[in-house]
Amino acid sequence: MDGRALPDAGGESAGGESSAAPVILLADAATDVERALVKQWLSGAELRPSAVLPLDSQGLDRSLAETPPDTMVTAARVAWLPRQRDGDGTAGWPGVLPLVNARRPPSLWQARIARRDPGRARVVLAEPATVAALRERWGGTGSFAHFVSRQARLALERAERPLRGYRYKVPRHVVEAIEDSPQFRREIAALAARLGSPESKVAELAGTALEGLVASMSPLAVDVLSGALRPLHARAWEVQADTAGLERLRELNRRHALVFLPSHRSYADSLLLADVLADHDFPRNHVLGGDNLSFWPIGPLAKRAGVVFIRRSFGGDEIYKFALREYLGYLLNKRFNLEWYMEGGRSRTGKLRPPRFGLLTYLAEAVEMGYAEDAYLVPVSITYDQLREASAMAAEQGGGAKKSEGLSWLASYARGQMNRIGTVQVRFAEPLSLREAMAGDGGGSGGGSGDRDAWRLRLQKVAFEVAVRINRVTPVTATALVTLALLGVRDRALTLGQVRRVLEPLRDYLVQRDLPHSGEALRTDDGVRRVLGALAEQHVVTIYDGGVEPVYAIERGQHLVAAFYRNSAIHYFIDRAVAELVLLSDPADRWDEAMRLRDQLKFEFFFPDKESYRSQLSAELAQLDPGWATADGRAVLDGSHLLMAHRVLRSFVDAQLVVAERLAAHDPAEPVPEKDFLDECGGVGQQMLLQGRLHGPESLSRELFSGALKLAANLDLIGPGGQDMARRRRDFADWLRDVVARVITIDEIDAESRREAVGVEP
């Protein structure tokens, strides 16, 4: 059955034409008022059923068995509509505060609504299906009457959508539907054989796992949760959404499920995206997240509003993995949209974190196994002018403990969101067909080890492509440009004019490359002053105005926060920074050096494939000097109006240098315990900063040290090992010292050429 809405009286018959075939009408009416409304509607409609039965009638089995195969089965119910609030169909606070479901009010309320406001009581009719068609879809498992009743409820839900809005797409009887499917039973048998466990036991455990995973989508819970959590973001930011991108997605969503994969910088990300989608009448996403946010009372409410809480760790639990894949496959098959955050947690540095592949693996397997024809991945960029939680994340990077989530944490977070701090931009990148992206010459996920390795490699490339597309639509904010300018100056303050002269070539570069940005706000003194003032209000920038004119600098202790804002945009400048470093290498070795730098930075930034990278870097080098391959690199940089390596890369290569030198100092025969080693890097890094060997405190980031350690592991430098490893560790540290020296040289060239702008002697 499919669904459609009909007028509350005098409507057409289902399908819009009369038929000689008998019709069974299943009435989903729980109260006397609803039964009377359905009866009244039926008296004025053209539909003339041969039988009218309650939806859960005990006699339905007999009626279906005795009726001809061409008998049409349809269903009707009363759709109770909430009062309009601000022109939409969501239940307002008066309807949700007493926890009364405005979409299924108590019988005492129903009579009053039908009498005083009859437009809120609309009868909807499901699109009919023949008994023969229903038997064909049944599959032979369980009661046929029970199957028909369930299909009728689903069809009625579809019939209500034009009235309620498409944001309310509600899954029903999910666990039951999954367990009744022939594919589920086949997979259970195969899994039981692999595990050597009784099939009944595996089925029981899988059912329990599904019960824990499956989220309902109560419209009341959606409205209550949205109303309760809206203060966490509504006052803090003005939302600017990519409406053109949404319209493209709407058409695609008619045929396929969409999987929204946003960048993750704030707890508010999912709330903002949900509001943007609801405002444009998209169905609410099933949001997959960690069970750390399932605390009472938000957790139980969120689970009823489409939030799927997943265990943080389930490494060897094959039954849980199976249940998760089956659930994702079911949601894809029914075209429910999904949402999760591939980075696995909020970015502590402001740039995208490396993606995690677990959920994407199960999704790709579900598509490959035929649960859905395809799913489209939608990269989403959510970019903030400012974030109050950036300070807490910066403290974590300095070694502070993360505050656990709970009611007191939520209250504190809400208090911090009461005042406006800027704009948030939500942009949608070009969607990616998962089936097409995973197509390859190798076998599928279930092939041999070689096929499986090739499949995993394709999956990683898909995840990286999502990240590249997010970066491609992420706008460069005015905040990012201002912090980029101020962090490039060591321990100095700048006048307003000096800040503007640093910003001008940055804006010109963005315009020349046609990159998305809000740099127009920085074209005037007033615009720059406003951005600096907003940063000063949040104690990121300090202003001294006791002299001839105000001067601006990063507030002491706020360098990691400033770097957070800067890092949201630096991916646009990486090619330029690498090109500058390449020019300071031996001309005979420049392409090899470019590839070495790409490998050095690949754990921090997302690069395209090597051929694309070579093409992009060639264009950047040619912009610096058409004869770059043999040119005197120092002379080329001396004549450049824009130098970026020291502003973009210094904190990253400084952190790598700390890690490399500590590894070189360690006995190669001893293991390197990650936590203790990162603690050591933090302590020694602070000493190096005090000695002037590091540029600034933004290098002392636990996340940057962790990325550098992953780089070392990729180079097989972690050990344990022998003297060869000790030598390779020393070589690694020497090479990084050379890279840092080149970055410092570029800093000195920039200071010399812009002495009057930056106030720094070379």
Feature locations, PLM:
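Membrane-interfacial terminal anchoring regions of lipid-handling membrane enzymes
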Residues: 1-762
